[in-house]
UniProtKB/Swiss-Prot annotation:
Annotated site, Important for catalytic activity, chain positions: R218
Assigned GO CC terms: cytosol
UniProt-recorded name of the protein: Purine nucleoside phosphorylase DeoD-type
Catalytic activity: a purine D-ribonucleoside + phosphate = a purine nucleobase + alpha-D-ribose 1-phosphate; a purine 2'-deoxy-D-ribonucleoside + phosphate = a purine nucleobase + 2-deoxy-alpha-D-ribose 1-phosphate
EC nos: 2.4.2.1
Residues noted as binding a purine D-ribonucleoside in the record, renumbered to the chain: H5, E180, M181, E182, S204, D205
Binding partners and assembly: Homohexamer; trimer of homodimers.
Record GO biological process: purine nucleoside catabolic process
Residues annotated as the enzyme's active site: D205
Family: Belongs to the PNP/UDP phosphorylase family.
Function as written in the Swiss-Prot or TrEMBL entry: Catalyzes the reversible phosphorolytic breakdown of the N-glycosidic bond in the beta-(deoxy)ribonucleoside molecules, with the formation of the corresponding free purine bases and pentose-1-phosphate.
Pfam family name, one: PNP_UDP_1
């Protein structure tokens, strides 16, 4: 039945949901890549859709910005609508010089300055890692497409406008591939409620060089990332 944030019924969502931050990107993904699409959520403008990809039922829904927002939607999808796997498909900022604009990054894990996972984990550090099979399937899907992806750690920040830019030096030293705002939270929710999660990002801006993509490009492109996510679902079904 409907929750405070999702006005759908059991069965409206597939067992796998792709989740971009921007609900308009969710609409673009549904209209561009899925067939037989129907809208399944519009509460607070957080659009959700269900359709098929090569005959496989898949849903796509926005999750908003930041760990608190994405945690609400991920939790309700898992506990109230039977979702088993969440693939976040979003954007990230690069801090390393060898990571370039529009590179695709598959997050094996996510560091964070948020305390949300510590609240879940009795004030201890929780290693927010992606599901191994989902990660491997995404890497294999990228190889099949001929897309060179980066695989490693992300950093999920609580603040978009950080007061401590020196932290970027620390991230670079530790090999962080991209800075975003949700991966660690989605992994934590998935672990708490018995689901699986993965984050795939496209580099939308470079924190060091100042290069950036446009808002329109972020909303309506990044197709390699989406196709990798969708194809990885099919590989998971055939495993």
């Amino acid at each position: 039945m409907a929750t405070p944030h999702i006005n759908a019924e059991m069965g409206d969502f597939a067992d796998v949901v792709l989740m971009p931050g921007d609900p308009l990107r969710a609409k673009f993904i549904a209209e561009t890549f899925l067939q037989d699409v129907r809208e399944v959520n519009n509460v607070r403008g957080m659009l959700g859709f269900t359709g098929t990809y090569k005959g496989r039922k898949i849903s796509v829904m926005g999750h908003g910005m930041g760990i608190p927002s994405c945690s609400i939607y991920a939790k309700e999808l898992i506990t109230d609508f039977g979702v088993k796997k969440i693939i976040r498909v979003g954007s990230c900022g690069a801090v390393r010089t060898d990571v370039k604009l529009r590179d695709v990054v598959i997050g094996m894990g996510a560091c964070t300055d948020s305390k949300v996972n510590r609240m879940r984990f009795k004030d201890h550090d929780y290693a927010a890692i992606a599901d191994f099979e989902m990660t491997r399937n995404a890497v294999d899907a990228a190889k099949a497409k001929g897309v060179n992806v980066r695989v490693g750690n992300l950093f999920s920040a609580d603040l978009f406008y950080t007061p401590d830019p020196q932290m970027f030096d620390v991230m670079e030293k530790y090999g962080i591939l991209g800075v975003e705002m949700e991966a660690a939270g989605i992994c934590g929710v998935a672990a708490e409620f018995g689901a699986k999660a993965l984050t795939i990002c496209t580099v939308s801006d470079h924190i060091r060089t100042g290069e950036q993509t446009t808002a329109a490009e972020r909303q309506t492109t990044f197709n390699d990332m989406i196709e990798i996510a969708l194809e990885s679902v099919l590989l998971g079904d055939n495993a």
